[in-house]
Design a protein with these regions (language model features):
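Short, basic, glycine/proline-bearing loop/turn elements
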Residues: 8-11, 177-186
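N-terminal phosphate/diphosphate-binding loop that engages ATP/GTP or pyrophosphate donors
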Residues: 137-181, 255, 274-282
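Long, basic/Gly/Ser/Thr-rich N-terminal segments
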Residues: 1-82, 87, 281-287
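Walker A (P-loop) phosphate-binding motif
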Residues: 102-154
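Solvent-exposed alpha-helices and their adjacent loops that cap or buttress functional pockets
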Residues: 26-27, 62, 108-112, 138-141, ...
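Conserved catalytic-core segment of NTP-binding enzymes
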Residues: 61-100, 162, 188-203, 208, ...
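Structural motif
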Residues: 4-6, 32-35, 58, 67, ...
């Protein structure tokens, strides 16, 4: 894992571009010679990939330059881009270049004095990144200093860039710790990533650190990381994202059993008023749209309350968020 190889593009498929060190996605052409790194991928709506046993042809697993062998994919997805390995990239000492040896390291305990907000979801594409950058933006608008980190996932520059656009003063992810992907990482490796990200984000002296975990709460690495976060008391507040009300109820209950203080729900479930009401009835939590998370009032979510005071505080808080116009109120002339 994380070994860098030089490879030739043999056949274009799903990924027709690859990100450069400048973070620009460059077009790929058959015959191009590229630098990529071996890694696994776990993505229910993309590829499931593993590190191949030999040095034969492999696949491009992500736009971020992760390569491996695809062992599963959605039925409606294009086949992967095929690469032919030429050889390992080696340093001046003749050793293989492995990104893990070049990653940042941290200390314990991480995060410093910042309040840590965890964004975790039911699955891939449940709205985690949207919720995370929206919280960053809302807190920034409230006058807070906010840093952001993505602890797990597959290498891509897209998410860190949008966190920067949202106002985060410092952004780090698992790639900064030397991992092109966190699929199949051990607990020790995940803890190393977490402490590295937390330590270096804390150096910016933020009021808040917003952490996103990729994929869903039933995914192996997510479960390992949640256990680590719980054992070490790292998280102050949790926001859960989901696509439907039943998933909201089961996910929030699972997180509460792990002693995470879930303060709000977001994701695509929030965009159906009926589904949002169902979810709120199941959890007694505010179900918030992206636009509401981006409002300065979001900071009031992240205040510690007694068990007795939380229910009334949450009900009062919902009233302070801006009202999103109902689509039924549109007139023909405004469409």
């Amino acid at each position: 894992m994380n070994d860098v190889i030089i490879a030739e593009v043999v056949e274009l498929g799903r990924h027709t571009k690859m990100e450069l060190p400048t973070k620009r996605a460059a077009a790929l052409f058959v015959g191009d010679v590229v630098g990529v790194a071996y890694g696994c991928r776990y993505a229910t709506r993309q590829f499931e990939g593993v590190i191949p046993p030999g040095n034969g042809p492999c696949h491009l697993l992500s736009v971020g330059g992760v390569c491996g062998e695809v062992v599963g994919m959605p039925f409606d997805m294009e086949p992967p881009t095929i690469l032919r390995p030429i050889g390992y990239l080696r340093g001046a000492d003749g050793k293989r270049v492995n990104l893990e040896r070049l990653g940042i390291v941290g200390s314990e305990p991480p995060f410093g004095a910042a309040k840590v907000i965890l964004v975790v979801g039911a699955s891939m594409d449940s709205g985690k990144t949207t919720a995370a950058y929206s919280i960053v933006h809302g807190l920034t608008r409230a006058g807070a200093v906010v840093a952001a980190g993505k602890v797990t996932g597959t290498a891509s520059a897209k998410d860190p860039l949008i966190m920067e656009d949202a106002g985060a003063v410092k952004i780090l992810d698992f790639t900064d710790a030397g991992f092109v992907s966190t699929a199949q990482c051990s607990s020790a490796q995940l803890w190393r990533i977490l402490t590295a990200i937390g330590t270096h984000l804390a150096q910016a002296n933020p009021d808040y650190i917003v952490l996103e975990i990729a994929d869903g709460i039933v995914q192996r690495e997510t479960q390992l990381l949640l256990a680590l976060l719980r054992e070490n008391g790292c998280i102050d507040f949790t926001v859960y994202t989901c696509n439907d009300s039943l998933g909201v109820a089961s996910g929030v209950n699972a997180l509460r059993k792990l002693d995470f203080e879930v303060v709000a729900v977001s994701g695509s479930v929030a965009y159906s008023p009926l589904a949002a009401r169902e979810a709120q009835a199941q959890t007694d939590l505010p179900v918030l749209l992206r636009e509401q998370l981006q409002d300065p009032a979001v900071e009031q979510l992240f205040v510690k309350h007694s068990a007795e005071g939380r229910d009334s505080a949450m009900k009062n808080l919902v009233l302070k968020f801006p009202t999103i116009p109902n689509p039924l109120s549109r007139t023909a002339s405004s469409l």
